[in-house]
């Protein structure tokens, strides 16, 4: 993996396709005590843990570098803000806006929506 290499670790299933194919780097998955995914890319080991905070409308995704070298990490959130019973159709017009508050990114998917916080 070169210094400027980009490796996408996500995997989304679409009709007749899975993109990107980050599952190819998945070396281990543990369900207990928390869902934990371990990825290995050219000797670099990255662990992702996902959990929800009891009693809160919050999901935490934590990344840990288990390797010996630093890994630059860029996040590209895949976000659809809709009720889970609703259908969502592709639209060229989105009203996403964000603001940085200290080390927190506050994202609104449309005017008046509840914000998504990324730290």
Language-model features: locations:
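An extended acidic
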Residues: 1-36, 110-117
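Short acidic, glycine-rich loop/turn motifs
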Residues: 2, 39-41, 65
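Short small/polar-residue motifs
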Residues: 20-29, 43-47, 92-97
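Low-complexity, acidic Ser/Thr/Pro/Gly-rich terminal tails and inter-domain linkers that flank the onset
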Residues: 33-52
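Polysaccharide-binding surfaces and accessory modules of carbohydrate-active proteins
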Residues: 46-47, 51-119
